């Protein structure tokens, strides 16, 4: 069986945002992903999917101070976007990591760009964080979600005051 991480059109929404999309698209092709796929296909163009456009428009209207994206798995936090990483991001990421006992990491090169967090940082020059929740295999077993939620409650509370 394969893990499906894409929308119904075979586009991985977290590879469809206009933030270094061209570079990640080249990496997808080099990895053999050049058409709709169960994972990591960023579409024919950036922002080609209605889900991507909706999330972008929502963030523009809300003027958030930071973004949190939740994925699975690895119990790690991604917070960088190349040279565009906001200066206070590392301090915030360290605090978040200590709060939930996650490690700070860098995404694999095929996933370094084109994502929601990447676009948020690029568009607003504000901190963005991707939390890879849980430990084990994808999909994360439903039985693990309650424990992960308890861990992440502290993050959500901290985010309200920091």
Give a label for each model feature.
Residues 48, 85-89, 109-113, 145:
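Short amphipathic alpha-helix initiation/capping segments at coil-to-helix junctions
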């Amino acid at each position: 069986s394969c893990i499906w991480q894409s929308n119904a059109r075979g586009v991985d929404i977290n590879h469809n945002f206009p933030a270094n999309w061209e570079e990640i698209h080249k990496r997808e092709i080099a990895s053999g992903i050049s058409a709709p796929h169960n994972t990591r296909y960023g579409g024919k163009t950036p922002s080609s999917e209605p889900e991507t456009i909706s999330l972008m428009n929502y963030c523009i209207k809300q003027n958030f101070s930071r973004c949190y994206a939740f994925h699975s798995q690895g119990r790690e936090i991604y917070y960088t976007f190349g040279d565009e990483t906001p200066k206070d991001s590392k301090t915030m990421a360290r605090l978040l990591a200590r709060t939930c006992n996650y490690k700070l990491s860098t995404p694999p090169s095929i996933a370094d760009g084109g994502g929601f967090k990447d676009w948020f940082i690029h568009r607003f020059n504000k901190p963005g964080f991707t939390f890879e929740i849980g430990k084990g295999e994808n999909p994360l077993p439903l039985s693990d979600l309650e424990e992960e939620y308890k861990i992440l409650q502290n993050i959500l509370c901290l985010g309200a005051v920091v």
